[in-house]
Amino acid sequence: TLRPSFGDIEVSVPRDRKGEFEPQVLKKNQTSISQDIEEKILSMYAKGMTTSDIETHIRDIYGVEVSDTTVSRITDKILPIAKEWQQRPLESVYAVVFMDAIHYHVRSEGQIVKKAVYIAIGIDLDGRKDVLGMWVGENESAKYWATVLNSLKNRGIEDIFIACTDNLTGFSTAIEAVFPKTEIQNCIIHQLRNSSKYVSYKDIKALMADLKTIYAAVDEAAALDALDSLSERWCKKYPKIAPSWRENWSNLSTYFKYPQEVRRLIYTTNAIEGFNRQLRKVTKAKSVFPTDDSLLKMLYLAMM
């Protein structure tokens, strides 16, 4: 008899007098973990659950004890698959490639170091979007961006029409060396954030309205006229804003060469920012990863 708060319930407990009952999760006399439980462990790992949470969940639901080593052994099976994916051949030409880096803490030689995960998402000539790769490397630098771009080239990419970034450290130098014909479009939203960073609250609405006349202009000539007007109005109060736009103009204005449909696609890095949010959501429970491989396998599972 079960006695919940709403009243007693009579439960009939079946008896297996002949010993014919066969459990579905753990078979009789089974000492190893079933494929089903391994898949559950991979699924939980992909959702960002910690090893201890996975152990508790498996014990509570399935009555099976698993250790840290077991969880690592099971999730390590993903590594060859992830590395094969990372080396797969790519299309020869991509219309747009979005590139970004997100940062994590990883143990290395007894110390906790900050590492960057370099990410590339491509849109091919048929409009299909695909994650081209994720690379765990040193903190953002031109040298490592060159490594990433050369990896893409070695996997078959011959040309990228437009590379969209948020003004990444060292990126312009690296892409000019590997794909010299590629045009760069820096993210307008990031430029707006930088422009508004030190603006007083009472001025922000008016300033953002003036900035919109620049990035929403019908063409580059009109945008430059709007930039001149903004400079005249705000240069004394906020002397760094207009020069910042002028300094980065060649990489901020690329989208004016294209029709509106293409402009909407490339003037921000929303396509990769959404993917980054997905990764951060899964990895937020991990403050430090024990190895580069442990980080890579979680990111790969999160992507799948």
Predicted regions and their residues:
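RNase H-like nuclease fold core
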Residues: 12-17, 24-30, 64-65, 73-165, ...
